[in-house]
Amino acid sequence: MSKPIVMERGVKYRDADKMALIPVKNVVTERDALLRKPEWMKIKLPADSTRIQGIKAAMRKNGLHSVCEEASCPNLAECFNHGTATFMILGAICTRRCPFCDVAHGRPVAPDAEEPQKLAQTIADMALRYVVITSVDRDDLRDGGAQHFADCITAIRAKSPEIKIETLVPDFRGRMDRALDILNATPPDVFNHNLENVPRIYRQVRPGADYNWSLKLLERFKEAHPEIPTKSGLMVGLGETNAEIIEVMRDLRRHGVTMLTLGQYLQPSRHHLPVQRYVSPEEFDEMKAEALAMGFTHAACGPFVRSSYHADLQAKGMEVK
């Protein structure tokens, strides 16, 4: 029997070390090894990376993190080249260990009390008009990190009064009442929390999370702020069916969610959950049509769509795919 991994505080555990801690193991089959990316999944990189390096330098200078880098997002080059990024607060170490996600797992250090001001100054320096703020899960904090979100929102608005802020929050497991009390006092312009996938395979995809808890979080925020858009997203290609995706969309509408994102799951490494199928652009178009018919005000559905991909355009109801 192998010895359990003893996690050191502040150390990032990734790939094999991270997956070794997950009770649901990833067994690679011959079929998984043969599954190749179709042509529509090919990305063309920009010829000039000057702006990309500039954003990375600004992040490093202020000790900030982007989910674009930490989660190995396939859209990083495009978004950075257009001068946009999704900021990840509360460090780069997550207390969860979801096998689809490339963010490091471990025992995080205490939150940086100066981060809200650093973040606000960086955003002001970049002259951003729309910003997405997300975080790792912080099950070690009594409020799950909600006060840190609120502090960041307050600091950003103080330096950039005209900015629109979208928060992509964790589930605040076991701390929903406390977290919502804090967030309701300093609400964002868009409230986002991702379901990620369908109930049947939730234990495999999001160990430690609960499908109905996440729906309740979205519903309760919407009840407190009916004027603020609520948003959620799923990754597809993990073994779910299109019919199951449609049913999740219905659940989201029943809980008051008004914006939807659907995108193709891509395996970050061989240690992560394998891609079970590639959903075609035509299927994404069909699911978008279903979403709009259900009453979503906007649905961004496409192979490269991610929750914060062109989030400013999504918020305006413009076409994103």
From Swiss-Prot:
It is found in: Cytoplasm. It is an enzyme of class 2 (transferase). Residues 80-297 form the Radical SAM core domain. Its cofactor is [4Fe-4S] cluster. GO terms for molecular function: 4 iron, 4 sulfur cluster binding; lipoate synthase activity; metal ion binding. GO terms for cellular component: cytoplasm. Binds 2 [4Fe-4S] clusters per subunit. One cluster is coordinated with 3 cysteines and an exchangeable S-adenosyl-L-methionine. It catalyses: [[Fe-S] cluster scaffold protein carrying a second [4Fe-4S](2+) cluster] + N(6)-octanoyl-L-lysyl-[protein] + 2 oxidized [2Fe-2S]-[ferredoxin] + 2 S-adenosyl-L-methionine + 4 H(+) = [[Fe-S] cluster scaffold protein] + N(6)-[(R)-dihydrolipoyl]-L-lysyl-[protein] + 4 Fe(3+) + 2 hydrogen sulfide + 2 5'-deoxyadenosine + 2 L-methionine + 2 reduced [2Fe-2S]-[ferredoxin]. Its EC number is 2.8.1.8. [4Fe-4S] cluster 2 binds at C94, C98, C101. Belongs to the radical SAM superfamily. Lipoyl synthase family. This is Lipoyl synthase. It comes from Salmonella typhimurium (strain LT2 / SGSC1412 / ATCC 700720). The lineage of its organism: Bacteria, Pseudomonadati, Pseudomonadota, Gammaproteobacteria, Enterobacterales.
